[in-house]
A protein has these predicted regions:
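Conserved, mostly hydrophobic/aromatic
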Residues: 23, 92, 100, 125, ...
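N-terminal positively charged helical leader segments and presequences
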Residues: 1-77
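Alpha-helix-loop-beta-strand connector modules within alpha/beta enzyme cores
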Residues: 36-54, 75-86, 115-135
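Glycine-rich phosphate-binding active-site loops on the catalytic face of alpha/beta enzymes
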Residues: 28, 68-76, 99-113, 136-167
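CE4/NodB-like, metal-dependent polysaccharide N-deacetylase domain
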Residues: 45, 91-97
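Short acidic active-site motifs
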Residues: 9-10, 34, 87-91, 121, ...
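Structural motif
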Residues: 16-20, 63, 95, 128, ...
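Glycine-rich beta-to-alpha transition loops that act as phosphate-gripper elements at the mouths
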Residues: 4-5, 55-60, 81-92, 105, ...
């Protein structure tokens, strides 16, 4: 997941990703033209490293998008949705994305003061999700290894790739 607080560290964070990772370009505060330029730059940098690049939101950001995140209807490639509550899980059950990002699994700077998702809630989500669930929010490799036993399909983060959390 990208966001504005990554600043100039975005491309260093992409270098830290394991080969074959997915990158969701968000940066919602940018104008559409700026988001398109950023998306193209991320694609040029990430694609040779074997990464998928998905756009967040309804507006097309590039000619060749590997997928869409939180976009209404269908889009090119992989479709993913955010899931912060039961209403969003019900929405995912109706729209049938290929992946859900469940968040916040742990305390995170993206949701300051927000409570982490209780393990019982995550277990219930994993049981009822129509697709694979990606854990997001305060994630590290160690936390992901523990959650793998619960059945997560993978994990995502922001700060961990900036070197601000232990991996």
């Amino acid at each position: 997941m990208t966001d504005e607080r990554m600043g100039d560290r975005l491309f260093a964070a992409i270098r830290r990703l394991p080969r074959g990772s997915g990158i969701v370009v968000r940066h919602y505060s940018l104008s559409l033209a700026e988001r398109r330029r950023l998306f193209a730059a991320v694609q040029r940098y990430a694609t040779p490293r074997g990464h998928m690049v998905l756009r967040a939101g309804p507006e097309r950001l590039g000619r060749r998008e590997d997928g869409v995140h939180n976009a209404p209807g269908t889009g090119p490639g992989l479709r993913t949705h955010a899931m912060h509550d039961w209403a969003e899980l019900r929405h995912a059950r109706r729209t049938r994305p290929e992946l859900i990002f469940a968040s916040p699994v742990h305390a995170t700077r993206s949701h300051p003061g927000g409570a982490a998702m209780p393990r019982a809630t995550l277990r219930a989500i994993l049981r009822h999700a129509p697709c694979g669930v990606i854990a997001l929010g305060g994630m590290t490799a160690r936390r992901a290894a523990h959650l793998k036993r619960l059945g997560i399909a993978g994990w995502a983060g922001i700060d961990v790739w900036l070197g601000e959390q232990p991996r």
